């Protein structure tokens, strides 16, 4: 690799859309090849990876492969939430470097939040990398690849062209009965531990009509479950009508009216934005799944203040109480950070009490990971690693016990399952998910794949349920 990287500026001042990429047949001079994508991190990254594949299929005719050795273009979509995830990326890049040493003309690109955070530093650390692009510039991949091949030097584009990404994506392609739809990007909360505002930018909502059109297109292709995505999804304020804005509650109500949409989910939420309008949607919209992921992070007001979360434990419990008034049996999952700088034994016990009071069904819980550039990175950390691991173990054991109890109570009940496909453990059975995100395996004919089916839960296992189809 020769030359210094080209750094792409925003497309136009303010991020105005460029000419849309073609979504139709490949041009005669386009080279058909193979594309491999490795995805780390959250559901938003999974969505972005799918869009990378869509863009490169439309522009260059690239087809996905499960084997990097067969690929002409290799992309890694990165996550910078935790240090270990970041280091895994460079370890993986080192493996792929060997493919270039074999004389193949392979394009290797790094996208996602690590790319946004590190930029040209990635090229300096791994000079064999050809492309570095941020979450907001994945739509420019065809241009970046073309420029790399023509100019013979690496290309870097980690700009924040606001909503331009969505204006230039091909029409969505359904991959099964469930689909992700991104409705907003970025976060403006600036929690003291979090890198998201720095890697994905501040909150920008997609226009209301654009989201509704995408959902309708997916439903017409057989999608039955819509997962609305955003770093702070319930802060959605989509331009709507003449100078007005639609919130998440209105968006959910509108999507529920689209023919074919049988279940709606959304993630990830922030407690500050969990509004009465959204609670009313849980009351009024039966398609809205009986499940909520609402990250609380801690149960101590002192720690929540240090995290700059903007609410107290009592305020969090008040919102859950109002929600359960309209959905008494709703399952609640959350995120927890254990060992945040300055967290005392008393602080941790308050987190454990909150877990007991709420009865969380599931959690994504981690030991605090210092992220350079965030305010919390400057806080003194006096908690031993042994204590952090002990606290995490206690927390996870408590939540797992709650989850097991909920699963046991489901035995004998009728649950509606969206059938995803054959079971991985037994191809003669089907598998699907309940509203509260339980995987269910049951004997049934393959013609039910992609449909909602009522089943009776017959057994609760550690990580799944067993069931039988309700006789028609």
UniProtKB/Swiss-Prot annotation:
The catalytic activity, as recorded, is: N(6)-dimethylallyladenosine(37) in tRNA + (sulfur carrier)-SH + AH2 + 2 S-adenosyl-L-methionine = 2-methylsulfanyl-N(6)-dimethylallyladenosine(37) in tRNA + (sulfur carrier)-H + 5'-deoxyadenosine + L-methionine + A + S-adenosyl-L-homocysteine + 2 H(+)
Spell out the residue ranges making up region: Disordered.
1-24
Domain Radical SAM core residue range list: 173-407
Q: Name one GO cellular component term.
A: cytosol
Binding positions ([4Fe-4S] cluster 1)? 42, 79, 113
Q: What does the UniProt entry say about where the protein is found? A: Cytoplasm
In this chain, [4Fe-4S] cluster 2 is annotated as bound at: 187, 191, 194
**What cofactor requirement does the entry state?**
[4Fe-4S] cluster
Q: Which InterPro entries match?
A: Elp3/MiaA/NifB-like_rSAM, Methylthiotransferase, Methylthiotransferase_CS, Methylthiotransferase_N, Methylthiotransferase_N_sf, MiaB_methiolase, rSAM, rSAM_horseshoe
The subunit field of the Swiss-Prot or TrEMBL record says: Monomer.
Q: What is this protein called?
A: tRNA-2-methylthio-N(6)-dimethylallyladenosine synthase
Organism expressing this protein natively: Stenotrophomonas maltophilia (strain K279a)
């Amino acid at each position: 690799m020769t030359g210094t990287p080209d750094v792409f500026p925003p497309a136009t001042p303010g991020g105005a859309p460029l000419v849309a990429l073609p979504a139709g047949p490949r041009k005669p001079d386009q080279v058909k090849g193979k594309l491999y994508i490795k995805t780390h991190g959250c559901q938003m990254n999974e969505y972005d990876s799918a869009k990378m594949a869509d863009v490169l299929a439309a522009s260059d005719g690239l087809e996905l492969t499960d084997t990097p050795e067969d690929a002409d273009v290799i992309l890694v979509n990165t996550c910078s939430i935790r240090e270990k995830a970041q280091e895994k990326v460079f370890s993986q890049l080192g493996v792929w470097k060997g493919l270039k040493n074999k004389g193949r003309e392979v394009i290797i690109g790094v996208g996602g939040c690590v790319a946004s955070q590190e930029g040209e530093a990635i090229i300096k650390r791994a000079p064999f990398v050809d492309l570095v692009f941020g979450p907001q510039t994945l739509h420019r991949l065809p241009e970046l690849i073309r420029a790399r091949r023509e100019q013979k030097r690496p290309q870097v584009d980690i700009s924040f062209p606001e909503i331009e990404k969505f204006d230039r994506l091909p029409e969505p392609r359904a991959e099964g009965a469930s689909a992700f739809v991104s409705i907003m990007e970025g976060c403006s909360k600036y929690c003291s531990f979090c890198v998201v505002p720095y890697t994905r930018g501040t909150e920008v909502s997609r226009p209301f009509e654009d989201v509704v059109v995408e959902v309708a297109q997916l439903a017409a292709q057989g999608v039955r479950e819509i997962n609305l995505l955003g770093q702070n999804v319930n802060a959605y304020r989509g331009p709507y009508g003449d100078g007005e804005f639609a919130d998440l509650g209105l968006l959910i109500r509108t999507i529920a009216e689209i023919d074919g949409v049988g279940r709606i989910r959304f993630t990830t939420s922030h407690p500050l934005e969990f509004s009465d309008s959204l609670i009313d949607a849980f009351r009024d919209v039966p398609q809205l799944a009986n499940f909520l992921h609402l990250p609380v992070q801690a149960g101590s007001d002192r720690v929540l203040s240090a995290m700059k979360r903007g609410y107290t434990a009592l305020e969090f419990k008040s919102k859950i109480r109002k929600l359960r008034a309209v959905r008494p049996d709703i399952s609640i999952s959350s995120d927890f950070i254990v060992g945040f700088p300055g967290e005392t034994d008393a602080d941790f016990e308050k987190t454990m009490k909150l877990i007991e009071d709420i009865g969380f069904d599931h959690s994504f819980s981690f030991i605090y990971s210092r992220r350079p550039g965030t305010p919390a990175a400057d806080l003194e950390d006096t908690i031993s690693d042994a204590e952090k691991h002990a606290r995490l173990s206690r927390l996870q054991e408590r939540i797992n016990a709650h989850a097991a109890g909920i699963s046991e109570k489901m035995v004998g009940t009728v649950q509606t399952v969206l059938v995803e496909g054959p079971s991985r453990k037994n191809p003669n059975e089907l598998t699907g998910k309940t509203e509260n995100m339980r995987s269910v395996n049951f004997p049934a004919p393959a013609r039910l794949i992609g449909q909602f089916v009522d089943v009776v839960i017959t057994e609760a296992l550690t990580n799944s349920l067993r069931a039988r189809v309700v006789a028609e």
